[in-house]
Amino acid sequence: MTISILGARVIDPKTGLDQVTDLHLDGGRIAAIGAAPAGFSASRTIQADGVVAAPGLVDLGVSLREPGYSRKGNIRSETRAAVAGGVTSLCCPPQTRPVLDTLAVAELILDRAREAANSKVYPIGALTKGLEGEQLAELVALRDTGCVAFGNGLKQIPNNRTLARALEYAATFDLTVVFHSQDRDLAEGGLAHEGAMASFLGLPGIPESAETVALARNLLLVEQSGVRAHFSQITSARGAQLIAQAQELGLPVTADVALYQLILTDESVRQFSSLYHVQPPLRTAKDRDGLRAAVKSGVIQAISSHHQPHERDAKLAPFGATEPGISSVELLLPLAMTLVQDGLLDLPTLLARLSSGPAAALRVPAGELKVGGAADLVLFDPQASTVAGEQWSSRGENCPFIGHCLPGAVRYTLVDGHVCHGPE
């Protein structure tokens, strides 16, 4: 199919392009930016006056819940939610059932994605077998199958020697290791950030040091091994400072933050609403401000949804007995637009943190607009608004933003030149 997108404000953060112009797509590729190629004839024209055309968003943390947790979601439903939020490429974590630690599971996910996915799916493989922190998974074979990085989720590898050897092995093959830095002992049993709010509510706390202690250890071992490292779900201002110091030393380190950590604080749990039960926990306004500053400066180069859909019953128990997580990929772009609305970021910088930044962090082939490249795009109206939940594709409705009026509205999402979201 050939498509012409006319009169859009085309923003490509990777190249610095920001101008009102046209895009022409042919055979799933970008044929031209600006004037149409000689002999080009569009079978479909999208009039895009007042609309921004940008690289499709790249989300580094989307739990697809398949295999093993179909009551919470599946590849079809959660990638449908992803394209509704402007996401064309996503990474799914290894916490499936069975764990994504073998070729069979990786191939199952990728085969299912080819069959049912609306967006492109890039698995993150398990660093250790069963995420148990003892034996390395088949990292090279998993890479060759299609895994873009490797991690152990929130399950810490307790033995320093085991982790050091794992990082050295990964460095040998130029693999990227994803860390979720939370010390198991300091976080054990915790439900909320350890501070005034947790004390007031009588909830067991998870101190900032649960992140910073684990982060410091991991950074030292990264320095020793030279491995490419990505630190996911940074939650504290001090954690962001440690990342900045590592980058100043020249370590090959990148980081992301969950979008909701840039919006919410531990004050949100005041009413014991399980919709705000997340792991790692929401932290203080000071931490939120520190994270925002790190995003603005580029120390944190990626904003992700860290989408975790749940069935209704998973959030109906008392706070401490509920499952943590927020279903949020469907709102990634409009929620992120609140950062522009608040004056924290300009639009090109926001789009960099949502596309080229995350793509570079995990070397995902996405996040840019170039002639001959894949026609993965999001078209959105920055002046319109989205009422969260009016239309909902994810199986998980565990989202505290449902009912909120958010800035910006996704009009079209295209993957390989095919309209996956928007008017057919």
UniProtKB/Swiss-Prot annotation:
GO CC terms, sorted: cytoplasm
Query: Gene3D superfamilies recorded for this chain?
Result: Metal-dependent hydrolases, Urease, subunit C, domain 1
Which InterPro entries does its entry note? Answer: Amidohydro-rel, DHOase, DHOase/Allantoinase_Hydrolase, Metal-dep_hydrolase_composite, Metal_Hydrolase
GO molecular function terms noted in the UniProt entry? allantoinase activity; dihydroorotase activity; metal ion binding
At the top level, the lineage of the source is Bacteria
Ordered alphabetically, the record's keywords are:
Pyrimidine biosynthesis
**Gene Ontology biological process terms, A to Z:** purine nucleobase catabolic process; pyrimidine nucleotide biosynthetic process
Q: Does the keyword Glycoprotein apply?
A: no
Q: Does the keyword Transmembrane helix apply?
A: no
What family, per the record?
Answer: Belongs to the metallo-dependent hydrolases superfamily. DHOase family. PyrC' subfamily.
Q: What does this protein do?
A: Non-functional DHOase.
Subunit structure, as described in the record: Heterododecamer of 6 active PyrB subunits and 6 non-catalytic PyrC' subunits.
Q: This protein is called what?
A: Dihydroorotase-like protein
What organism is the protein native to?
A: Pseudomonas putida (Arthrobacter siderocapsulatus)
Gene that codes for this? pyrC'
